């Protein structure tokens, strides 16, 4: 297996048809691949988050992280974008789910996509991964130490769903 990959900033269609920034990494070798949506933490779409996405590509996955703060502070440094998002009250749950759905649709469109998709989030992104997994069809979900996940279950949350791994 080759560990060669390509990583780049792209535009995807998010909630409400909005065009949002995302960072994608994918292996160069041909083959059938699962896709993973990585959801960033409150400090945002930073260098460390992009490194997680690159590591997934090295391990054979198509991976993308949508910039959830694209609307509040387009092109801003991660810390400034995070501050703008916090000042606006954070990312609304409905918009988050729509942006993640857009990321999945992007992954689905890639050559070699095998139709299997997972979502991973860390810190506040862990909460977001949980919410996305409750609302969208994922084959796997990982919540990496997301705190204060929900006060009440999201409306329409299935009573039975695939296991969610919570790392704390």
What is each model feature region?
Residues 1-168:
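N-terminal cap/leader regions of alpha/beta-hydrolase-fold enzymes
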